[in-house]
């Protein structure tokens, strides 16, 4: 199993909406595929604690849709994270595949989503949550795309109007953070109106 990678970015959060004067930090997680780094994900959790974030942002594929999907490591990780931080989670293609293909996966996705929501995870399935940090309003959006947007070599074209059909319009009163699993569609995310896409 490959090790996890920590990359730090410093971004200036400012727009015509409002400047954020006080710095804050967020941890962004994606594509762990139910991996565990140390017993109970102890290495990953320690690295996250070292960053001292105000919130955790998750852009999917925390589990793997395989013939025998396992979600235990991801559920345990979410349980530890929600003890200390607010967690905002958007599905990736693996979660979506499990959700849609109930013939193959039965109720595995429903059990997974119920478990993480019961722990306090804000699961954003084409939805959003409003958050205020240092008196600045943020809206965190979770974009969930169907499998046609993830097929290798023949992906569907994503447009801002498709995103608007799924999410509605960005909140003009807030700084809009879009959690979207597929980075190739960044131009459509920007046209839709995301101030920051992850």
Would you name each region that the model predicts?
Residues 28-29, 59-60, 90, 124, ...:
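Generic enzyme active-site microenvironment
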Residues 87:
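Conserved phosphate-interacting/catalytic interface
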Residues 15, 32-34, 95-196:
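Conserved catalytic scaffold of divalent metal-dependent phosphoesterases
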Residues 23, 53, 84, 173-175:
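A general structural motif
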Residues 50-51, 78-84, 190-195:
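Short, conserved loop/helix-junction motifs that constitute active-site signature segments
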Residues 19, 80-83, 116, 171:
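Short helix-capping segments at alpha-helix termini
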Residues 1-77:
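N-terminal active-site segment of His-dependent metallophosphoesterases
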Residues 38-44, 60-79, 96-117, 190-191:
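Metal-dependent catalytic neighborhoods of phosphoester/phosphodiester hydrolases
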